[in-house]
Structure formats: C-alpha cells, structure tokens
C-alpha cells in the first residue's frame, strides 16, 4: 500500500498538484478499511491522476485537436458553411445596397447545392459518458474540505473522457473512412525504414505543404481548385513513432517538423490504434490536411445527475451529440507505405 500511495503522490506532484498529497493521517484512515474498500479507493485515486494527465495533454493552448471541434449549437450548422468556402467557377453576384448576406448565401446554395452535396459526407454521432460517486464510502477517507474537491475532480473527468473519445475515435474513424473510400489523395510507396525513404517523404511533404497554399486541384480527391491560405489551417496527423523517425537530425533541414509541433499543429494518433490499410494494401504513415477537410461539430454537451438514496451514490453522466464528417474538395493527403520497423 505504501508503494501505491507514494506513486500516486509522485504523479500528482508531477502534474502540478503539490497540495493534494495523501498524508500520514489519511493513510491511518485508509488502513482501517477492508482490503476491498482500499482497492476501490485506490482505483478512484488512480483514475483522477490519469485524467489529470489527459487534461494536461488537452490543454486548449497546446492541443492541436481543439481546432477541429466547432460549436454547432449556438449558430446552427448547414451546408452553407462550406458552400461559401469552395465554389469553383461561381459567377460573382452584383451587390447593391439592398443585397444582403442572407440573399447571397441563398442564391449560392440554390445554384450549387447538388454538386456540393454529393461531395459532403456527414452523419450524426451520440455518446454518453457515465460515472458514479459513492459519497458514503469517500467520507470515511477524506476530510470534509478535501471530499468536495475529489468528487468535483471525478465529475470533470467526463469532459476529458469525451475529448479523448472525439480525438481517438471520431477523428481517426473519419480518416479511415476517407482512405477506404478514396476521399483523400493517397501518396503511396513511401518508407521511413531507410535514409533515402525518409528524405524522399520529407521532401514530398514539404512540396505538398507549399502546394497547399497555391490555387490548384492536385491535393483534394474531387480535383476542385482549392487553396489553404494560412499556415494555421495546415495540420499534420501521425503516430509518434513515425514522427520521431522522420525528424532525425541529419534531415532536419528538409522540413522543420519541430516548428510545426511548437505551433500546436501536429496531432498524434495513439500507437496502438489500427489505421487500417489503403485500397492498395499499404499502411497510412502520415497525413497533411487542411483542417476544413474534417468536421467535428458539437450540437449538445450536457451533464446530468441522478441521486440513488438507498445506495448512497450519485450517478453522473455527460451526453455529447454532434455532426462528424469530411468532404472531397478541401486539401487532404495521406502518405502510405511500409509500416515503421527497426531502422535498417
């Protein structure tokens, strides 16, 4: 038990929670519990520490994934949001003092709705995140002033769990669907398992990165003339093993991946997530995308509570609903090839 407590205390200090340590007095109280109660309590403490680690990862100022989450609740979400982004060959409307933005948007939708709809792939998603707080058990082990903070921390885990779900499930599932349906440009034949392969891939990524900023039809699957005008719209998505292999020192001049990371524009996929294969049977290694190619739009993010008096517990849940999807006319490239292996 002492080793477990020491580990939890060290984890909390590492995460910046220096004032929340398991004290000698608390240990004496815990020792009075049954072994089953001790393990239940330690498991809850571990979950809190784990979620604090996730919250550090999901810092709004550092986390690139936050750019992909948009609010669809307050303003609504319609096809017009993308209609005005990429309309190829639209005849400019003559605007006079009485021609409103709403009229212009309506005319554009009317004229080009069918073409754009066929290249939009969106569907709703719903997910519920539950947790149970057993107040009666926790009161045995915490001073009153600490109990409230502990329970609040456990409830706020739900928000972090939802963000992890959105990144590791919704985002990755969309990428896999884009690959399967060839809704993304696939650059194949790459390897990061030898020096020539790394250099070739870096040069290709750099060329495409620059190309995103030019009006052309090379980088989206529908071959629409498109442009990614600002650096902060260009994102890279990969696994850490691929990223570390690509940024080895001798090739750092080919493309400054570290600068992209510092600017918060690299999203890391968990190593144990299966990205599937391309239609040609290759492994996806790296993605370069305009953030507008993917949509995760939140329509509802609502917490609920239900108290169960005869069991001294409160059930909390977070309901998340939204729209997820992608399109075929915004720049997005997948680089595929051999999976990462031991360096040759």
PLM region spans:
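Extended, compositionally biased alpha-helical segments that mediate assembly or anchoring
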Residues: 1-58, 257-344
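Alpha-helix boundary/N-cap detector
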Residues: 2, 28-40, 145, 149, ...
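Short glycine-rich, low-complexity/disordered patches
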Residues: 24, 57-64, 164-181, 217-219
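Mature, Sec-exported extracytoplasmic domains of Gram-positive
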Residues: 28, 154, 179-201, 305-307, ...
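Assembly/oligomerization interface modules of large self-assembling protein complexes
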Residues: 44-130
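Long, hydrophobic alpha/beta structural blocks
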Residues: 98-102, 106-108, 112-121, 138, ...
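Long, contiguous amphipathic alpha-helices that act as assembly "spine/axial" helices in icosahedral shell
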Residues: 114-183, 315-322
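Extended oligomerization regions of viral-like shell subunits
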Residues: 196-302
